[in-house]
Amino acid sequence: MHLEKIDRDGRGRFAFLAYDQGLEHGPEDFRPNPEAASPRFVLELARDSDYTAVVFQQGVALATRELYPEVPRLVKLNGKAGLAKGEPYSPLLCPVEYAVKALRAVAVGYTIYLGSEHEARMLAEFAQVVRDAEALGVPTVAWVYPRGKAVGSDTAPEIVAYAARVAYELGADVAKVKWSGSVDSFRWACTSAVTTKVVLSGGVLTESPGEFLAVVDGVMRAGGAGVAVGRNVWQRPRAEAGAISKDIVARVRA
């Protein structure tokens, strides 16, 4: 494990600002706050609120390589567009070496759609990502999202715990999973992940900042390692986005 690249104080707490949604969700995600269509907005939030890293796809990381270079980048290695339906598969688009050496990534991430009929390909691709990242000394973050016709509720406690365990079994340093609905059930997900750190997948915009912050509090009480939040920050106007960012980071690092 190479968490020292992103673990600033040695406590294993992480607040990632996710901005990889533009590929899969399209520009509609930016409509609530058009300023967020520019990665400059997100980089400024990350800088001002001291997020652990900002999450970019390859192209955004390349386009902004010289913009606020002091903000650490976590490069998302795979992705897909959101127009085609059916069983999801998110192919590897960016090699680990390119992310680290050309894009200056301090960590790399990969999505696995657990339960998809294409699951085996994604498991194999991520296993290789872990080996490549290990060779270069950078941590890996596994987005583990149960999805597909074989999956019922993707937030059922046993499904979330399974997702966390898969990340551990494959060698991920950090697992990004959905909220399972309660502190006790999320605690079991964290226990199931053993030494892999578990962070919350932020999800869709909540009606109020307080609603999302209550979930963050639950994650931390359950033994979670933090959050990877996107829409619940940058879909809000700048002042509100900055305020909730500071609240998120403070809770994670408390």
What does each model-found stretch correspond to?
Residues 227-234:
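Short acidic/histidine-rich active-site segments
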Residues 1-11, 15:
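N-terminal basic/disordered segments at the start of proteins
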Residues 220-222, 234-254:
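C-terminal helical cap(s) of enzyme catalytic domains, especially alpha/beta-barrels
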Residues 14, 18-54, 59-81, 88-198, ...:
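Alpha/beta enzyme core
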Residues 179, 202, 231:
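Active-site proximal loops enriched in glycine and acidic residues that flank catalytic Cys/His/Asp
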Residues 6-9, 26, 148, 236-237:
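Surface-exposed loop/turn and secondary-structure junction residues enriched for glycine/proline
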